[in-house]
Amino acid sequence: MRILQLHCDSIEYTPTKKEIKSAEEIENPQTQRLEEIVVAFVAIEDGDDSSVAKNAISQIKNSMEKIGCKKLLLYPYAHLSSNLAKPSTAMSLLQEMESEASDLEVSHSPFGWTKSYKVQVKGHPLAESSKVVTKDSTTKDDDEDTSDALKGESTIRSYWKIMSPDGTMINIGDYDFSNHKKLEILAKYESAKQRQVDEPPPHVALMKKLAIADYEPASDSGNMRFFPNGRLMKSLIERYVTDRVKEYGGYEVETPIMYDSEHPSMVSYFNRFPARQYNIDSEGKKLFLRFAACFGQFLMANQFQMSYKNLPYKLYELTRYSFRREQSGELVGLRRLRAFTMPDCHAFCKDIPQAVDEIKVRFDLSQSVLKELGIDESDYDMAIRFTEDFYNENKSAIEELVKKHGRPVLVEMWKEKFFYFVLKWEFNFIDNLGKASALSTDQIDVENGDRYGIEFVDENNTAQHPIILHNSPSGAIERIIYALLEKAADDSKKGKKPQLPLWLAPTQVRIIPLKEEFYDFCNNLCDKISAQNVRVDVDDRNESIGKRIREAEKEWIQYILVIGEKEAGSENLSIRDRQTGNVREVSFDDFMNEINEQTSGKPYTGLNQSQHLSKRPQLMV
């Protein structure tokens, strides 16, 4: 069955003549006008049956609930398919669909008639959608263990709204997105929950071109290999995020990557966490690879004797790796992986008021971390999800988070609590293909303190279970690199020269000698610059000067020093600045200060390849 679904201000249609002998009988055909309605143009295909009809109506009703519309017109529309069912079957299934939708204000246009029509479609992100519904639409892979939370994620009742910084909430169908195009993309992407990849985003080509990462064909899909350049970048981001979390007060730990699937806490948690896991059999024991740091940290916290005076108490781990068996059609580049590196900080709080106060601190931390990583607030949009009860009891706290963001946010409100958390927010990056990916996130978890037997003693010397916050201030490290590359691709599209933040550049300065007679000078200069904690290399290959400069440009190296007789005899350095395209002379000290201004406060590591390009192998990607 194929469906084109439109949320309309109005539709007018007029039956003009019968197309087939078995067309529906109607008396006195007249123009019909319907307003504020969802119109489902439906083509019943050969092989469709009652199960398909029920599934189709279920999907239509689910999307109508999200936009707050209860008025439906079923419009038979054969032009959507070339594989139509027999007219008798089609009419019967349309009647079944209308019956299944009897709790709505439902009607249908006559079957088998030629009709003229005029339709006015609304302009919000969910106003237009298409569906292909088959008997297998809801079938899952036989070898896939799927949590109850994951199964329920597609059926949970959600209300989608937009909240402004002043706290007002508007139904998504009534919001004017004209000044918030990225938020509109996020709203459509999240509410439709379509993660399929149609084409690779630009960062995939860039991660290969810059020798950062590539697919590993000898591994499972979604498991990447990082070349020396990529490992250097990744390690610096890991160190920076870890340093910031430790400054915030997180205590770093290390926990196993696999756990007993039959451990009571694990079984219960599986069914409250929306993720697919890798399963392992070891000597008859069923194990799974962790999909977050929660398990190890919670089992560790179970061994602590805590007082309310210790709270909020924060544990932190950088998981290398966390594993999630994302569906194969959703995997692409560094955006969505099956093995990824996740900074994960849990805060154990006394109660909801303390958790609400702490989540504000972590919100500020997350904004700051992203900014220092090279991702500004204008680069992402915020989504926040909560239960209706939690919103009613903590409205001002939620509004404060939105006010901190400073722009309208996407809201998903749940009628009832289905997951272990009652609130979750995330910052979502929108890439060049209009796909959203969560970076920073935090959750308020009201179940796992009890589930894992974690306790603290309150003011009355009574044992209590803590509220737990789940924060990743950056999101997966791989996604940070993805976002930086997508930003660079967007800059290139706008005519700007793409670049990485200087502190993450695998090579920050390249020295190119004009002739072999300047090699000693270049090597000494290289050592002098390197001693200032700057990643510098020497292109001593037997290639033309033009080719070596072009290749440095292709590697996005910000500073190029071409050394000839004039430069070797000068007290100043002649610097080619990639961003301006200009060559300028500066003193050594001024040049070092310029670099330091861009890298100050960030971790440093030396080159992850030979200092001389002549000694490097050529990477074939």
Curated annotation (Swiss-Prot):
- Choose one Gene Ontology CC annotation of this protein and give it: cytoplasm
- Looking at the record, which segments are called Disordered? 128-150, 598-621
Q: Write down the InterPro entries for this protein, in alphabetical order.
A: aa-tRNA-synt_IIb, aa-tRNA-synth_II, aa-tRNA-synth_II/BPL/LPL, Anticodon-bd, Anticodon-bd_dom_sf, DTD-like_sf, Thr-tRNA-ligase_IIa, Threonyl-tRNA_syn_edit_dom_arc
Query: GO:BP terms for this protein?
Result: threonyl-tRNA aminoacylation
Role of this protein: Catalyzes the attachment of threonine to tRNA(Thr) in a two-step reaction: L-threonine is first activated by ATP to form Thr-AMP and then transferred to the acceptor end of tRNA(Thr). Also edits incorrectly charged L-seryl-tRNA(Thr).
The Swiss-Prot or TrEMBL record lists the needed cofactor(s) as:
Zn(2+)
| Cofactor binding, per record | Binds 1 zinc ion per subunit.
Keyword annotations of the record: Aminoacyl-tRNA synthetase, ATP-binding, Cytoplasm, Ligase, Metal-binding, Nucleotide-binding, Protein biosynthesis, RNA-binding, tRNA-binding, Zinc
One Pfam family per UniProt:
HGTP_anticodon
Report the principal subcellular site.
Answer: cytoplasm
Q: Name the family the entry cites.
A: Belongs to the class-II aminoacyl-tRNA synthetase family.
In the UniProt record, the gene name given for this protein reads thrS
Q: What is the name of this protein? A: Threonine--tRNA ligase
Q: Summarize the subunit comment.
A: Homodimer.
For region Editing domain, the annotated ranges are: 1-137
**Domains (record comment):** The N-terminal domain is an archaea-specific tRNA-editing domain that hydrolyzes incorrectly charged L-seryl-tRNA(Thr). Catalysis of tRNA editing is performed by the charged tRNA itself.
**Can you state which reaction this protein catalyses?**
tRNA(Thr) + L-threonine + ATP = L-threonyl-tRNA(Thr) + AMP + diphosphate + H(+)
State one molecular function term (GO): zinc ion binding
